[in-house]
């Protein structure tokens, strides 16, 4: 859950949490972590939800489907090979989760850092090329490797199919990004 949530937040530049993580005991407030500055602040404000029920709950996306339950291996480890399979049912649950993320009522320009780079209407008439230009860096970051032209074409054709059916650009890109977030290549498999 932590890895998926952090990966989605990093990929989309989310300014809110994907979903609540009650097992996350310590919570920081004040956005102290800024590695580009090379400095740590003199004071860090940290809350502990487990010990103080009145601690702030961070803002998060609304209406998110619960994270699919993994099979737990012996002794609490979740990295044993026989437990790391991805069944069709689990993949379907991840697809539902990813679609609920991009269709959240507060998934918009205020909460999504890459909104203008990915979801906003392009300022060009060559929409097909704009889709490819937007998806290439997103796919490379999501899949952590250089992507092939065939992969780029597959995802850009998917987005274009929505546009041909009369769907607006933002909705088409949301559906495509939802597919990226549900791809086994995004799950570190």
Predicted ranges, named:
Residues 1-189:
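Low-complexity, glycine/serine/threonine/alanine-rich intrinsically disordered linker
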